[in-house]
């Protein structure tokens, strides 16, 4: 499984990456460069351990999670024109959004909105480009109708994960790797004195509203 970590600068994204992977990637060290941190962890599994004890294979292989720590985001335009970064993001299976919530003036819900908007805009650009090509071909009415539905949703600033698709639709969409369709885990990076406390009602309501 591949998981991508995204977040604004100083959200603690790379710190989370280091904690998950045991690596020591430089924190706050991007300096405007489009570098990406990669890390892999083995997933402990008691069932695999038991089978290994019984069958005694030469090698015991555990499932892996591959984490990608993407460069920090600054605003809604960060993904525009950055086709290389967007391509890398489309290759992950799920997104972890790291939100800064350890300062009095932090606004994690605004950060959440910014990050989701970036993904929506990136998907909309892909949809618009594909629709333009289909209009010239005039040979795939089913795909045209499907992408029109996607475009309407994205133009309303809604994620594609909120839509339901048929099996045929899924086949047509499988090659796009839409960012706003990927499962999302939201991480609120809070101070130690909030550890173990439930999220505020405002946070929970916003996540529920967005289907997260």
Regions found by a protein language model. Give the residues of each.
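C-terminal-of-GTPase-core extension/linker across diverse P-loop GTPases
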Residues: 2-7, 11-17, 21, 133-212
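Class I S-adenosyl-L-methionine
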Residues: 52, 128, 204-208
């Amino acid at each position: 499984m591949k998981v991508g970590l995204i977040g604004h600068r100083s959200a603690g994204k790379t710190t989370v990456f280091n904690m998950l992977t045991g690596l020591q990637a430089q924190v706050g060290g991007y300096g405007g460069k489009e570098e990406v941190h990669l890390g892999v962890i083995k997933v402990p599994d008691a069932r695999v351990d038991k089978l290994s004890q019984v069958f005694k294979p030469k090698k015991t292989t555990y499932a892996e999670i591959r984490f990608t720590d993407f460069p920090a985001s600054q605003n809604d335009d960060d993904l525009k024109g950055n086709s290389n970064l967007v391509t890398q993001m489309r290759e992950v299976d799920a997104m972890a959004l790291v939100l800064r919530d350890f300062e009095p003036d932090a606004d994690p819900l605004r950060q959440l909105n910014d990050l989701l908007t970036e993904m929506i805009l990136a998907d909309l650009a892909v949809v618009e480009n594909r629709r333009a090509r289909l209009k010239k071909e005039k040979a795939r009415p089913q795909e045209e109708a499907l992408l029109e539905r996607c475009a309407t949703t994205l133009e309303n600033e809604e994620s594609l994960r909120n839509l339901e698709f048929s099996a045929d639709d899924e086949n047509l969409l499988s090659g796009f790797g839409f960012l706003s369709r990927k499962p999302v885990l939201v991480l609120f990076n809070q101070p130690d004195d909030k550890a173990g406390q439930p999220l505020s009602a405002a946070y929970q309501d916003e996540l529920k509203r967005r289907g997260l």
